[in-house]
């Protein structure tokens, strides 16, 4: 067992150090870009409700879960337990998969909006696709570095 795991010392930050350490700094950007996806998808024209429903579910779920997780880190709820490192890695892996699926489906919806709809709706969906892929990239990077932290704990 690694020395840090044996002694119960966690490498997770608490307090406002969450916003100054990597990869936890990415919480801010995940929050911003996830919120943009949520806003753009909810305000855009819905050509296929089932696809847009999954995109909304994924973006709202990740937005709320990221907010709650960041808040719990700030208040120090992890209490230096290593199980929170596992939770962090697992959540970001799941969020990466959710957002990747949502990004692909949102791109499909935008492609189908190309003909026969107002240009405004097409631009809103294209913006949602771009921000969704940015959010996916942020979650993937956070997941990779969380897995590295988990492996070394």
Swiss-Prot record:
An individual GO BP term: protein insertion into plasma membrane
Recorded GO CC terms: membrane; plasma membrane
InterPro entries the UniProt entry points to: MAL, Marvel, MARVEL-CKLF_proteins
Membrane side Extracellular: residue ranges: 47-53, 115-125
Disulfide bonds: none
Origin: domain of life: Eukaryota
Entry GO MF terms: structural constituent of myelin sheath
Alphabetic keyword roster: Cell membrane, Lipoprotein, Membrane, Transmembrane, Transmembrane helix
Membrane topology: Multi-pass membrane protein
Cytoplasmic side of membrane: 1-24, 76-92, 148-153
Post-translational modifications reported in the UniProt record: Lipoprotein.
Membrane-spanning intervals of the chain: 25-46, 54-75, 93-114, 126-147
Keyword presence, Transmembrane helix: yes
Keyword RNA-binding carried by entry: no
Subcellular location field: Membrane; Cell membrane
Record-linked Pfam families: MARVEL
MARVEL domain span: 18-151
Function, as annotated: May be involved in vesicular trafficking from the Golgi apparatus to the cell membrane. Plays a role in the maintenance of the myelin sheath, and in axon-glia and glia-glia interactions.
Family, similarity comment: Belongs to the MAL family.
Subunit structure: Interacts with PLP1.
Protein name per Swiss-Prot or TrEMBL: Myelin and lymphocyte protein
Name of the gene this protein is made from: MAL
């Amino acid at each position: 067992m690694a020395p840090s795991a044996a002694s119960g010392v966690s490498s997770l930050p608490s307090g406002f150090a969450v916003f100054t350490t990597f990869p936890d700094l990415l919480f801010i950007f995940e929050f911003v870009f996830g919120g943009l996806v949520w806003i753009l998808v909810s305000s855009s024209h819905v050509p296929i409700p089932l696809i847009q429903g999954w995109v909304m579910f994924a973006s709202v779920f990740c937005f709320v879960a990221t907010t709650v997780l960041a808040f719990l880190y700030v208040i120090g709820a992890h209490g230096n337990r290593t199980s929170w490192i596992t939770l962090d890695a697992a959540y970001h892996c799941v969020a990466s998969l959710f957002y990747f699926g949502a990004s692909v489906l949102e791109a499909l919806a935008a492609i189908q909006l190309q003909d026969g709809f107002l240009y405004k709706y097409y631009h809103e969906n294209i913006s949602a696709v771009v921000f969704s892929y940015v959010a996916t990239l942020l979650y993937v990077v956070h997941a990779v570095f969380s897995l590295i932290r988990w492996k070394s704990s």
